[in-house]
Each structure stands twice: as structure tokens, then as C-alpha cells.
Amino acid sequence: MLRARHPFFDGKLLNVKSAHDRDALFAFYYKCVIISYISIFVSVLGETGCGPVPCVSPRKLPGRKDVAFIKAKHGKGAAQSGRHSHSGSCAQRATPLWKQVLLTLLIFIALLALLGGALWQNICYNRTHYTAEFYQIHSRKLTQSCRVVFLTDVHLREYGQDNCELVQDIRRLAPDLILLGGDLVTYGEGSSYDNMLSLCSQLSQIAPVCGVLGNHEDELYFLDGDQALVEKFTAAGVTILRNQEARYTIHDNVISILGVEGSPKNFYNYGASAFMDAVETQTDYDLRICLAHIPTYFTEHLENYSFELGLAGHTHGGIVRLPKVGPLYTAEEGFLPDYAGGSYALANSATLIVSRGLGDSSRVPRINNVPELSVIDID
């Protein structure tokens, strides 16, 4: 596993996995691929006779007396063939058809192996590494800057025993507040509770931690009837917001955190609409952050309310991200989604950050899509 020192804007050097190291590793691998392919191509040119062939050194042509002697002894045709057989022209070697087919097949197999190896290397890298993505947000009222670490969709993945590597990196980031975007557990896998509780307990020793439930926790809570789920989070030091607000005073600034529950289609059915209407009139805070697990919640409903920063996850970055195209698919938006990872401007002038998340999918592996730990610096 690569561990890199990554420079931050404040001059600190921290031991985290960075996009720079990922790009350097991929660049080295692809250079090896290109060199290998060029070597195969050059060797094939030599085998098929497409390259230069050594010329036969010209010999002295027979004179008239020699020609007459050859005609008298062997006939006219022999003299002509003898003359042309010693010409200085270069002959091309003919390659049998079976050899051409074999070489073409070898090239195809080699190219397929190289592409397959690159894909497998990409998948393996994404299973063991993550990148710290940094975002800079300007606030109108904050008197002193603060740092927020946002992590979401950690299920089906563990970074070191009990996520010790992830916790160590977060500790070195020195956040003022840690926010969770949901899906820390996997529906149907009760054994993942231990990892979730251990991670939350360790995070709560670094900074205040609060967050929302994801769709996996909702299924555990509503479908399996695990009414003690929120209590388990609370016991681990995490405040779970279910259409609720939490406030923190950081560097003499009051930060309001809104946590909206459920999915966009349930906005009017389970109290989210009434909750947002109730807190809309508040003004006694310096910064307001809104949390929702699903990013389309913001574009469909939440951008009609007042806050400066929105945070969401759920999409896993689209799972597969194509070069020059972006995320391939999400359940809410279908193919080529608009909100699957990155920062976006909302209609209320707020910034929406959609994290690619830290976890994995049980069906399709991440391809060209490194997991993300989001670091937001607000000034």
C-alpha cells in the first residue's frame, strides 16, 4: 500500500493517500505498457519482412565475351538469368500466411493482457487506497476559519484493522468537526456493526461527530425494526440527526448543522418539509451546513432553503468513471448523472459537495474511481 506525504495549503505535511501518488503510479504503469507494446510491434515488423532487408552485394557483371561463351555452352536463357541473378536490387522475403496469422493473434493477446492488467491494477488500487479531496468554501459571517472532515458510505470497506489507517489520517488532518453522510453499515450484514461502532468511537475522540442515516441504516431501522440503531450511534459518541438540528461553537462561531432524513420522494411524508420550514426563520448562527444522504435531495427540495454548504454521498462516485466523460451511472439519475462527485453551485447560492465515498459496491467494483475523504476548509 502506498502511503504518501501530501502538502496542504497551511504548510503542513500529512501522511495521507493522495491523488498525486495515484496518478504517478498509473503513469508509471502505462509507460511500461506502451514500451512493451512498442517492443512487440518492432519485433513483428522484422518477422513479417516489412522492415529493411539487407541487400545482396553487387558482383561484377559478365562482359560480352563471357556472355557469348555462356550462350554457346548453355543457351541464351542461361546467359540472361546469369546476368540478372547478380543484380544489386534488394529482394523482399515472403512471410507464410500461417505466420502472419499467428503474429496477429499474438499481438491481440498481448494487447488484451495489457489492457486487462491495467484494469485489474485500477480495481485493486481502488480497493486499498483513498484520496483526500480538499474544498475551499467562503463564509459571509465566520470570523475564523474552520476545517470539516466529511466521510460517507464506508460500508463494505475497512482501511486497516478497525480502520486504524483512516482514523490516523483524519487525526492528522486536525478537523474542528467531523460529519457523516450515512451508510456506515450494510443492510443484511449485522457483523458490520462492530466496525461501525469502533470507527465512530475513535472519531469522537478527535472532534465532535454528527451525521445522518443512509439508505442502508434506514432499511435496518424501518424494515428490520432495529429501533436501537440510533442509540448505538449515540453510545459511540455520534449525534444522529433525523430531521433535526445540532449546534456547535467553534472558534467563537456558531455552526448550525441540519440533518434531513430519508429520500427526496419522502420529503413531504416524514417530516422533512415541516422541519426545514421551521428552521428557515432562524438567523442566530454564523454558518449553516445541511446534510442529506442522497444528492438529488438538494436539487429537488433543499436548495429552496437557506444554508451555505450542502453535503451528500450515496452515489459512490458513479462506481465506474470514464475518462473525459465522468460518472457512468447512479440509481437516482440513471446514465451520465450530473451529481455523482465534486462540488456544485445551487440555486440558493450554496455549495453542494457530493463525496465519492469511502466504501464499495457488492456487485460492481470501482473503476477509475478512487474512494474519497472530503476535507472542507471554510473561511
What are these model-predicted stretches?
Residues L151-T152, I178-D183, V209-N215, L241-N243, ...:
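Active-site neighborhood of phospho(di)ester-bond hydrolases with catalytic His/Asp-centered motifs
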